[in-house]
Amino acid sequence: STPIKSSAASDVYKRQSLKRKGIEIRLNAYALSVYDTADGITLTYTDNSDNTPYFWEGDALLLATGRRPMTDGLNLHAAGIRTDTRGALIVNEHLQTTAPHIWAMGDVRGGALYDYLSLDDFRIITNRLFGNKKRKTDDRIPVPYVIFTDPPLAHIGMTEEEAVKRGYSLQVSRLPAAAIPRARTLQQIDGMMKAIVNAHTGRIIGCTLFCIDAPEVINLVSLAMKNDLHYSILRDFIFTHPSMSEGLNDLFKAF
């Protein structure tokens, strides 16, 4: 799977939004034990900063353990198919396995486990078998992702911290969701938009949207990035009003 990227600025907005909904986040926590009670469960954990034990009572406990391909017992090695340590089939940029006549698509090939990538896997393999054989996995980078929280979180490209580490000269813009008319008409003013632009080329390096309609708006940023468009295209684009998309006008106006 792909690790969730974030940044200090968007983290502040996310924590504030969750806190208003009565959701508390405990960081640096290490679970020690959990047991049933008459009313639900009790979790014992420690704070890694000082090893102080804490007790948390709740109705239920959700374990987010991730997913892995169910390839055990398929005897894939007999067909010449190699797997990685998690059981995912090892593939090349055309999704061809180590057995030249076998391809893999979807979660079984590991990597980012998104439905929309599985659909693109189909396009790549179809192109390889019946097309010009040019389509490959590198063509779809960068890939956006969405977490359907309330408000939803969408991201594409690098975070500000990643871009700084790679030596980019940056311009960064932030826009509170409350500044977008559509967010006010929907009474969904929590969150923010953030964009990172290469100061020398004007190309968009990354974008984080933590606001209503983020899953839709991120696709416009993705389209601009994949086509190597200058940020001014989104800055000057005529969007419908009122819509969350027109927030991109103001977000990129700051550069």
Task: Go through the PLM ranges and name each one.
Residues D36-F55, L61:
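Conserved beta-strand-loop-beta-strand element in the redox core of flavoprotein oxidoreductases
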Residues F55-N132, E216:
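FAD-site-proximal beta/loop scaffold in flavoenzymes
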Residues S1-A9, Y13:
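Single conserved hydrophobic/aromatic residue that forms the stacking wall/gate
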Residues S10-A29:
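N-terminal glycine-rich dinucleotide-binding loop that anchors FAD/FMN and/or NAD(P) in oxidoreductases
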Residues M105-E162, H241-F255:
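A conserved FAD-binding loop/helix module that cradles the flavin
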Residues L27-D39:
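A conserved short coil-to-beta-strand element within the FAD-binding core of flavoproteins
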Residues E24, F55, R82, S169-Q171:
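Conserved beta-strand segments of alpha/beta enzyme cores
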Residues F148-F255:
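Flexible, glycine-rich terminal cap/loop adjacent to redox cofactors
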